[in-house]
């Protein structure tokens, strides 16, 4: 079986037109016809039904089933090409979400600098959901990811390296700031919220907390910028729901624990594709990031 034939096959399933496939790959139509014939003979089945009188091509049920396998093969081949190309380079494609990158990752920089790895990092800055997709596509060597639960995907090699609570955030002179021992989410929901947008896992945590408390808090503003969110909260434009990992002493904010039974946590995990063979530099980066000594 020729790998190119799989590409022809998948394109034919997509277009249902031999001439179009030939044009897409700049080959002759008989080349496409013979490739499909060889595949059908190899598997002893018919993948396409040809209605020559109406010039129609129909994909059989076995043809559709085979195409599912073909798509996975093509996807893995493309991932392998990306990973092998990067293996020849010294740089490490490293996913880093905004909050983790700004308030958690810097504690590792002395060790990375000493190991000569800091200048090898090619940082990709996106939310954890986007970075997870890039990992799956083989476009990242590894990443630090935020989540509400530990990752369980078989396709992912993941290790929880830290956790931080998600709390109600208010200005220092806000009425809720007096409740140092904490507030319920229902109590906090009496005030308008400023939240992070759906790129952050905080949006999911917010919805879960509201559902458990059986309340519908008013959201007056959503943002993708943590600094803007904190400034608006400090300016009494609303309160927020944020990991205290993202707070600084000079923010003028107070983090209040939730008194509800279930309190969400911001879980930080180190992750790579399960079948990804890390380069020596990427493996050294992994070892540093997973070592408690460097927290």
State what each model feature region is.
Residues 40-59:
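A short LG(V/I)-centered, amphipathic sequence patch enriched
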Residues 152-159, 164, 227-277:
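Beta-alpha-beta core module
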Residues 127-131, 136-140, 146, 201-256:
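Hydrophobic hinge/microswitch elements
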Residues 12-28:
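Short helix-boundary/capping micro-motifs
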Residues 183, 191-213, 278-286:
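Secondary-structure junction motif
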Residues 155-193:
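Flexible hinge/capping segments at coil-to-helix
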Residues 89-152, 222-223:
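Central regulatory/effector-binding core of bacterial HTH transcription factors
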Residues 42-43, 66-87:
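Alpha-helical linker/hinge and terminal dimerization helices associated
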């Amino acid at each position: 079986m020729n790998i190119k034939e799989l590409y022809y096959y998948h394109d034919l399933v997509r277009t249902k037109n031999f001439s179009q496939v030939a044009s897409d790959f700049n080959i002759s139509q008989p080349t496409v016809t013979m490739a499909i014939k060889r595949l059908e003979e190899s598997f002893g089945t018919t993948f396409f039904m040809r209605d020559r009188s109406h010039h129609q091509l129909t994909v059989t049920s076995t043809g559709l089933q085979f195409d599912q396998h073909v798509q996975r093969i093509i996807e893995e081949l493309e991932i392998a090409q990306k990973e092998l190309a990067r293996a020849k380079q010294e740089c490490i494609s490293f996913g880093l979400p905004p909050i983790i990158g700004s308030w958690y990752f810097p504690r590792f920089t002395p060790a990375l600098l000493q190991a000569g790895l800091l200048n090898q990092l090619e940082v990709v800055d996106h939310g954890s959901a986007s970075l997870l997709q890039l990992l799956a596509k083989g476009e990242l060597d590894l990443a630090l990811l935020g989540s509400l639960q530990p990752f369980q995907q078989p396709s992912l090699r993941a290790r929880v390296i830290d956790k931080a609570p998600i709390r109600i955030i208010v200005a220092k002179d806000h009425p809720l700031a007096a409740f140092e021992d904490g507030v319920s989410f229902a109590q906090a929901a009496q005030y308008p919220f400023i939240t992070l947008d759906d790129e952050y896992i905080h949006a999911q945590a917010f919805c879960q907390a509201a559902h458990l408390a059986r309340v519908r808090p008013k959201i007056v503003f959503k943002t993708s910028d943590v600094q803007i969110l904190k400034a608006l909260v400090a300016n009494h434009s609303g309160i927020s729901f944020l990991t205290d990992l993202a707070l600084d002493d000079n923010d003028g904010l107070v983090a209040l624990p939730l008194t509800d039974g279930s309190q969400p946590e911001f879980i930080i995990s180190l992750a790579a594709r399960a079948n990804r063979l890390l380069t020596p530099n990427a493996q050294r980066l992994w070892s540093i990031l997973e070592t408690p000594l460097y927290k």
